[in-house]
Amino acid sequence: MCTSGQIIGSLLVLSVLEIGLGVSSVAVGAVSFSLALREHTPQLGDSSPFLLCGICGILCAKKKSGLVMILFSACCICGLIGGILNFQFLRAVTKKTSSLYPLHLASMSLACIGIGGCTVSSWLTCRLASYEQRRMFSEREHSLHHSHEMAEKEMTDNMSNGAPQLMFNGRVQSMF
């Protein structure tokens, strides 16, 4: 079983990877766009749903709040969908004889790596949320147990002061 620190470390590494993929995708997209303008061919495929996913991943690893985890999961799903669409669009237009073939191949490779990263990040976010839920439940249970012990201790302290006691509505009251 992974600890919270290991999950957070893995999320940070994957988030940095996603940011790197996003920046690389933007660079490949910019080069591809400029070459497409020269050749008067349409440029398909977006660069970077992964950049946003990586930034949200770092925020999620730092904050660990429920809303940030939901935001990160949503970004991972959007990155996953964007990566799949990007791959499908590029696969449809890629011709091995095209001068843009190496750039399309690079974009498709980045999309595949990004899709894998988004999938693993989503899974790790679910693991982190589950771990945090168990931790909060354990803390709440410990707090309730501690407050119950303190109430029992207070009751026994009141009973042991030597004066006759009465129980009224769950409270110990002295008769004198």
Swiss-Prot record:
GO terms for biological process: negative regulation of canonical Wnt signaling pathway; negative regulation of cell growth; negative regulation of cell migration; negative regulation of cell population proliferation; positive regulation of apoptotic process. Its main location: cytoplasm. GO terms for cellular component: cytoplasm; membrane. It comes from the Eukaryota. It is found in: Cytoplasm; Membrane. It is a multi-pass membrane protein. Keywords: Cytoplasm, Membrane, Transmembrane, Transmembrane helix, Tumor suppressor. The chain crosses the membrane at residues 11-31, 41-61, 67-87, 100-120. The keyword DNA-binding does not apply. Acts as a tumor suppressor in lung cancer. Inhibits tumor cell growth by inhibiting cell proliferation and migration and promoting cell apoptosis. Inhibits metastasis of lung cancer by suppressing beta-catenin expression in the Wnt/beta-catenin signaling pathway. This is Transmembrane protein 196. It comes from Mus musculus (Mouse).
